[in-house]
């Protein structure tokens, strides 16, 4: 396809290996260092991109405190080849933060407010826990269900509303680990994982070029033996069918179609459309349905036009209703999360949006797809979606 000058193109994508938050590979690596390493290495392998041209570094991060505080985007960019004259901002849309970072850069490019951006996100959930420093307003219970801030219970609700069984969830969990392991063994993650130094379980320093979160030994029988994690009386959501708590970062180089053509760069993809949407916080995981419907409408497409989908696996009980109502549940094995998802790889909040988008682009490249959708739910009831076309 030919590019228009203000088209938004993805030049390259990279991510860290996903590390377990409890005693994992990144336990002695700070979030800013992880981010800076990733940005530097991605720029290094794209030598046609001059770091001086970067307009803004836009970095997703949810818990912006401790080492992730004081605008981690700037903290990280100062330790990269990007000059001090380039700007940096940290954004949060909870789980969708780094996809929002992509959308912010895209909107700037579309309106002529910059040509080259570095976007991505990070979350070191081992160093900055999910609830660190959080003080929810009790008055929120006057406006939304009291359990709306408890993600596992919202997944229980959504699964129950849509008749999703425990066995369906367990099968989905096994699938995630099996596909992620298969992708690892077959080298499907090779282009997206930027190797990083870390510490193994014995405390030895080594270079990791794989995700330590994947459990290839996962079986249906093993998952069936797990107790409910959130609702002990009659619950169906377990640790084995929930996204893992992990540490990681993701990064993309994004630019205008005109600048890519000027530099002689062959992009991975162009953004066709973007959308966000809100839903009842009590069923926060349903957000990808309205946001995807909105994004497809803006692109003049239907779900039947889409070759591949990356849906963030917050919970199996959440993902399955979304796939059902997007009318792709029966096409799951052909189109959806072909390299596994967050149940196997984890969900470092600020990282995940760019991570699933980049993984989608690699799936499209490896399988010859033209159109793809990356979408995810967002805590407290939102969805965010990006439609990509491979160039």
From Swiss-Prot:
What organism is listed for this UniProt entry? Pseudomonas putida
Q: Name one GO molecular function term.
A: acetyl-CoA C-acyltransferase activity
> What chemistry does it catalyse, as a reaction equation?
an acyl-CoA + acetyl-CoA = a 3-oxoacyl-CoA + CoA
What protein family does this chain belong to?
A: Belongs to the thiolase-like superfamily. Thiolase family.
Top-level lineage group: Bacteria
Q: What role does this protein play?
A: Catalyzes the final step of fatty acid oxidation in which acetyl-CoA is released and the CoA ester of a fatty acid two carbons shorter is formed.
Per UniProt, which keywords does this protein have?
A: Acyltransferase, Cytoplasm, Fatty acid metabolism, Lipid degradation, Lipid metabolism, Transferase
Q: Spell out the protein name for this chain.
A: 3-ketoacyl-CoA thiolase
Quote the subcellular location field of this record.
Cytoplasm
Q: What is its EC number?
A: 2.3.1.16
What is said about its interaction partners and assembly? Heterotetramer of two alpha chains (FadB) and two beta chains (FadA).
Biological processes, Gene Ontology terms: fatty acid beta-oxidation; phenylacetate catabolic process
Q: What is its main location?
A: cytoplasm
SUPFAM superfamilies per record? Thiolase-like
């Amino acid at each position: 396809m030919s590019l228009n000058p203000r088209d938004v193109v993805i030049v390259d994508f990279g991510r860290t290996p996903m590390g377990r938050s409890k005693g994992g590979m990144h336990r002695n690596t700070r979030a800013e260092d992880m981010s800076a390493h990733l940005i530097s290495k991605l720029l290094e392998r794209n030598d046609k991109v001059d770091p001086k041209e970067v307009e803004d570094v836009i970095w997703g991060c949810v818990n912006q405190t401790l080492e992730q505080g004081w605008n981690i985007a700037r903290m990280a960019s100062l330790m990269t080849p990007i000059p001090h004259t380039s700007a940096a901002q940290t954004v949060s849309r909870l789980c969708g933060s780094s996809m929002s970072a992509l959308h912010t850069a895209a909107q700037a490019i579309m309106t002529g407010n910059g040509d080259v951006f570095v976007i991505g996100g990070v979350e070191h959930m081992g160093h900055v826990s999910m609830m660190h420093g959080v003080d929810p307003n009790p008055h929120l219970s006057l406006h939304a269900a009291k359990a709306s801030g408890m993600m596992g219970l919202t997944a229980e609700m959504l699964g129950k509303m849509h008749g999703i069984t425990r066995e369906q969830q367990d099968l989905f969990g096994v699938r995630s680990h099996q596909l992620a392991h298969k992708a690892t063994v077959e080298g499907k993650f090779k282009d997206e994982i930027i190797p990083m130094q870390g510490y193994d379980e014995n405390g030895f320093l080594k270079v990791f070029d794989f995700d330590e979160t994947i459990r290839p030994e996962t079986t249906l029988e093993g998952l069936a033996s797990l107790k409910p994690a959130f609702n002990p009386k009659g619950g169906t959501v377990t640790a084995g069918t929930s996204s893992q708590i992990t540490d990681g970062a993701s990064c993309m180089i994004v630019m205008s179609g005109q600048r890519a053509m000027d530099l002689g760069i062959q992009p991975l993809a162009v953004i066709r459309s973007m959308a966000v949407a809100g839903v009842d916080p009590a069923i926060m995981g349903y957000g990808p349905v309205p946001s995807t419907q909105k994004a497809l409408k803006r692109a003049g497409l239907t779900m039947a036009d889409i070759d591949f989908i990356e849906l963030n696996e917050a919970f199996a009980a959440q993902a399955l209703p979304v796939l059902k109502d997007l009318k792709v549940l029966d096409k799951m094995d052909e189109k959806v999360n072909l390299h596994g998802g967050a149940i196997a790889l984890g969900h470092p909040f600020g990282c995940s949006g760019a991570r699933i988008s980049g993984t989608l682009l690699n799936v499209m490249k490896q399988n010859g797809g033209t159109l793809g959708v990356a979408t995810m739910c967002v805590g407290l009831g939102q969805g965010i979606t990006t439609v990509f076309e491979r160039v």
